[in-house]
Amino acid sequence: MQIQANGTLIDYATQKTILNMNLESPKVTLDKSAEDAFNFLSDVKNFESLMPENISKFEVLEDDKFLFALKGMPEIVLKKKEAIPNSKIVLGAAGGKLDFALTGHISEIDTDKSEVQLAFSGEFNAMMGMMIKGPITKFIETLVTNMKSAF
């Protein structure tokens, strides 16, 4: 692979352009402490309550891993990869064809108020990137918006 001047990668084995995709949700303010928000996101079963209405499957596979599917989309398995108490949770793809991470950034505003933002990052070929950018942006916005009423 070689990095081009514009920051894209070229995979010379496949002659495909690899895009580094970074998407961020809006920040949402919760009437919960940073510790409460962290604890909620640390328990993977809680992600079921954050999912969009068009979810067709949700299953906790292990204490730190879950599977979900949205109608018309393939199943995705996410595994907790990193946790920094009260400030950051990183979920990563666990198997499958796509390698990506979903990071929850938690900031304390006050003792009983916090701010959460989700960030999606991954490397995809240009065609895949164009296809998934819109749905993933909407997906992470839905997850963070649903946090307000989830707990």
Per-range role (PLM):
Residues D36, I76-L78, V90, A101, ...:
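Short acidic, gly/pro-rich beta-turn/loop elements at beta-sheet edges
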Residues N22-K27, K65, E75, K88, ...:
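Intrinsic-disorder/low-complexity, polar/charged segments enriched in Ser/Thr/Lys/Arg/Asp/Glu/Gln
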Residues I3-E59, K65:
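Hydrophobic ligand-binding cavity/cleft-lining segments
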